[in-house]
Amino acid sequence: MKITAIIPARYASTRFPGKALAEIIGKPMVQHVYERTAKAGLVSEVIVATDDERVAEAVRAFGGRVEMTSATHETGTDRLAEVAARIDADIIVNVQGDEPLIEPAMIDEAIAPLVADASIRMGTLKSRIKSLHDFLSPNVVKVVTDREGDALYFSRSPLPNFRDKWNDLKDEAFVTGRLLCYKHVGLYVYRRDFLLAFARMAPTPLELAEKLEQLRVLENGFRIRVVETSFESIGVDTPSDLDKVVEKLSRFQI
């Protein structure tokens, strides 16, 4: 079984232009993501997908594989699908290009269910929400699952919504930890044919309302297996996020 990890990496960014090439301890960010992804035990190969020659040159400079894509894609999924359509692979892993601290074990955790069960078409990760701030923040996507671990819904709103006894339930969740709430970790794994089919599906009402592409999958009646991970990463959306990553890498010499 061939498992290919694709890292979509754009140069343009509204909040942080050029972040894919931002230097972190002597290397561009995209190189950190590439090297850590390559350490995942289940990954056969790693490819950077970009529409910018500056990013492509940086990847070639450290010996990585790069595929050029159209500059007109509206989503990262579309960019991923363009590359997936022209390569030979059984499973495609979408690793965000702004996650320089991603743990290789996280990638393996997300891949494992698709290797073990041929009926699973798509997978992703979740981790425990540990603060009320994150639970209430629309920037933190929440997820609830069924007993098998398949997603029931993703939302920017609090999930679940505590109708009664809010203060008691809040303490259960965020003080005692007996009631678990989860946030979505944006790493996706697809069977190649399902990814290509997903990219052809029209946007759906809930997807457009929440601005969450994965809801398109649920609205079309497909399952997403969600695996809990204990690992934490830091997504780089702003220069201040980059400072946090640099500080952590410097301190622990990761």
Curated annotation (Swiss-Prot):
It comes from the Bacteria. It catalyses: 3-deoxy-alpha-D-manno-oct-2-ulosonate + CTP = CMP-3-deoxy-beta-D-manno-octulosonate + diphosphate. Keywords: Cytoplasm, Lipopolysaccharide biosynthesis, Nucleotidyltransferase, Transferase. InterPro entries: Cytidylyl_trans (IPR003329), KdsB (IPR004528), Nucleotide-diphossugar_trans (IPR029044). Its EC number is 2.7.7.38. It is found in: Cytoplasm. It is an enzyme of class 2 (transferase). CDD domains: CMP-KDO-Synthetase. Pathway: Nucleotide-sugar biosynthesis; CMP-3-deoxy-D-manno-octulosonate biosynthesis; CMP-3-deoxy-D-manno-octulosonate from 3-deoxy-D-manno-octulosonate and CTP: step 1/1; Bacterial outer membrane biogenesis; lipopolysaccharide biosynthesis. One of its GO terms (cellular component) is cytosol. One of its GO terms (biological process) is lipopolysaccharide biosynthetic process. GO terms for molecular function: 3-deoxy-manno-octulosonate cytidylyltransferase activity. Activates KDO (a required 8-carbon sugar) for incorporation into bacterial lipopolysaccharide in Gram-negative bacteria. PANTHER family: 3-DEOXY-MANNO-OCTULOSONATE CYTIDYLYLTRANSFERASE (PTHR42866), 3-DEOXY-MANNO-OCTULOSONATE CYTIDYLYLTRANSFERASE, MITOCHONDRIAL (PTHR42866:SF2). Belongs to the KdsB family. This is 3-deoxy-manno-octulosonate cytidylyltransferase. It comes from Geobacter metallireducens (strain ATCC 53774 / DSM 7210 / GS-15).
